[in-house]
Regions:
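Class I SAM-dependent methyltransferase "Motif I" SAM/SAH-binding loop
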Residues: 50-52
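Class I S-adenosyl-L-methionine
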Residues: 173-220
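A short acidic, Gly/Pro-enriched loop at the edge of an enzyme's catalytic core
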Residues: 106-115, 120
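A short glycine-rich, Lys/Arg-flanked "PGG" loop and its adjoining helix->strand segment in the class I
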Residues: 135-149
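Conserved SAM/SAH-binding beta-strand->alpha-helix loop
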Residues: 75
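S-adenosyl-L-methionine
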Residues: 83-110
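Single conserved hydrophobic/aromatic residue that forms the stacking wall/gate
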Residues: 1-15, 159
Length: 220
């Protein structure tokens, strides 16, 4: 079965890692059926990519019980903490899956996702790491395929480089729309509450060092 062995610890909301071969075969059993088969409802789905400990996914799920949340990370040991917290607090509208982010289009059907959060990803600053930036054109194209027509993407990062890089890409795209942009969300007013009310462990470390936190909300 697909449920991971960690389910034996009372964590039925963690799904095992899908191998690249399994996903590329196109036979992932929940593709196009996450809401119905996993969440047992028809609510919209929000993804958190590179979810780390799952802090953002869990808190967003707690605040938005009528939305389904899925955290994705290649390292399952990271989000085990988030899954445990969700289990302890009976937050049943958040799940986690261990998978490579570049394979999202094999995990989800076209138009299956309503919103994406990318929180504090590695900015991959060197040129040779461009292909690994989670907001490069190739990744944006993958996100566009799984987002519905009104779907949006949120990028929250301490990297002014990644913030500027992403804005530059969006401004050069024909159909992209920047809904909100702020290069220092805690110093400048007007930030969406979901961008400032939830702080991850690492975000608090950045803030303690007076590092600005940037945020962009956009459509593609």
């Amino acid at each position: 079965g697909i449920r991971d062995s960690v389910a034996s610890r009372g964590l039925g909301d963690v799904y095992k890692r899908q191998t690249r071969e399994e996903l590329l075969s196109g036979n992932f059993e929940f593709k196009g059926r996450w809401a119905k088969k996993v969440f047992n409802n028809s609510n919209p789905i929000t993804l958190e990519l590179g979810c780390g400990k799952g802090e953002y996914s869990v808190e967003l799920a707690r605040q938005n019980p009528d939305v389904n949340f899925i955290g994705i990370d290649i390292k399952g040991a990271r989000f085990w903490r988030g899954a445990k917290t969700a289990n302890e607090k009976n937050i049943d509208n958040v799940k986690f899956i261990r998978a490579q982010i570049e394979l999202v289009e094999y995990l989800f059907e076209k138009n299956e996702i309503s919103e994406i959060w990318i929180t504090f990803p590695d900015p991959q600053i060197t040129f040779k790491r461009t292909k690994h930036r989670l907001t490069n054109l190739e990744f944006l194209d993958k996100y566009k395929r799984i987002l519905n027509i009104n779907g949006c993407i949120n990028l929250k990062t301490d990297s002014e480089f990644l913030h500027g890089y992403t804005i530059g890409l969006l401004q050069a795209m024909n159909n992209a729309e920047i809904l909100y942009s702020n290069h220092d969300i805690y110093k400048r007013s007007g930030s969406p509450k979901e961008a400032i009310e939830i702080k991850t462990h690492y975000e608090n470390l950045f803030l303690n060092n007076d590092k600005p936190i940037t945020f962009i909300k956009f459509k593609i």
